[in-house]
Amino acid sequence: MLNDIDLKKLPSPCYLVDERLLKKNLERLNYVQKETGANIILATKAFSMYSTFPLIGKYLKGVTSSSLFEARLGYEEMGKQVHIYSPAYREDEFDEIMKYCDHIIFNSFNQWRLYKDKVKKYKNKKIECGIRINPEYSEIETDIYNPCFENSRMGVSLENFKSEDLYGIDGLHFHTMCEQNSDTLARTIKVVDKNFGKYIKKMKWLNFGGGHHITREDYDINTLIETILYMKNKYEIDIYLEPGEAVALNSGFLVCTVLDIIKNGMNIAIVDTSAACHMPDVLEMPYRPHIINSGMSNQYEYAYRLGAPTCLAGDIIGDYSFKEPLKVGDKLVFCDMAIYSMVKNNTFNGVNLPAIVKYSNEKGVEIIKKFGYEDFKSRL
């Protein structure tokens, strides 16, 4: 779809979100809602580009947040349901959290006991409360993303679950997945059903958390629908899902420019973007993002290592090859850069943040925001 966008006219670097691709994802998610009656909400920890919230709000039921600021953003910019979960809440923020949120999920019974009287006495609206459970079952292989690894701080395990403290609790929440298919969810639900079923039957809702790659091409949507309906019908409860990546998967790009080409045993292209600053998951995961019209390092004739303009020696994006030699001034386009990019980027070395750009059929290219020195200075 980028063929009708003139990359030369875009600021560099920039995050570019194509609303046509975003809408395609939202339509698929809405199909799941219609087939199951489940409620799907956006996990803003993955994607908080609020200029797209009016579009997202046409399809999804609201947002789920991990902090006061995310909750406020969802409340102000989408204006639908606002859920929140945190391993622990700050007392000096909790009154404001209640202002913005209609669902508050607690990580422990300690936190629930600390705040339940405040929630009960809150008069402006009814706030539903939940407890996060730790099913102690996850198929995530990377520990940094696995909330069920040994001695995890996330959620209440069966051994520590206290049924006497459930009075006033409306639902249970679990989040054990990361970029996974519905067969993983089906196996997880068997564990949750077996170990926590006697508590679920007392609830109004069950939240399946995030990590569901629903909009990926190979995702088995029928198994997802069957799994949702199984729990929904068995316990006569509402079901929530809170994907982040799936909402904006493959709908965004990072456009950058080649600044220099040097040789040191191989061709090295220095670009005006940074893995450390602009796409930190590349180093954290790690993974190698795809570039449009590129191949693996030995696939085409002209091979390059792409590096950043920072002082970090390991700020390497990856090794690529191209059918034609790169030149200074060439534009390169990284794929799938809407998620966990804008929400995690930083100004290490004083490297400027990429501009934020949106494309829609109605308005074409819109430059949503450009950053500069004051954005860097104001954080320090």
Predicted features, each with a name:
Residues 43, 176-177, 206-215, 243-245:
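Glycine-rich beta-strand-to-loop/alpha-helix junction loops that act as flexible
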Residues 38-205, 227:
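Active-site-proximal beta-alpha core segment in soluble small-molecule metabolic enzymes
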Residues 137-139, 178, 214, 247, ...:
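Feature marks short, surface-exposed loop/turn motifs that line or immediately flank catalytic pockets
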Residues 186-191, 220-226, 256, 321:
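Charged helix-capping and loop-helix junction motifs
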Residues 5-10, 170-175, 209:
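A short small-residue
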Residues 2-79, 85-88, 274, 322-335, ...:
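N-terminal capping/small domains of soluble enzymes
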Residues 227, 238, 243-380:
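Charged (often Lys/Glu-rich) extended helix/loop segments that serve as interaction or gating elements
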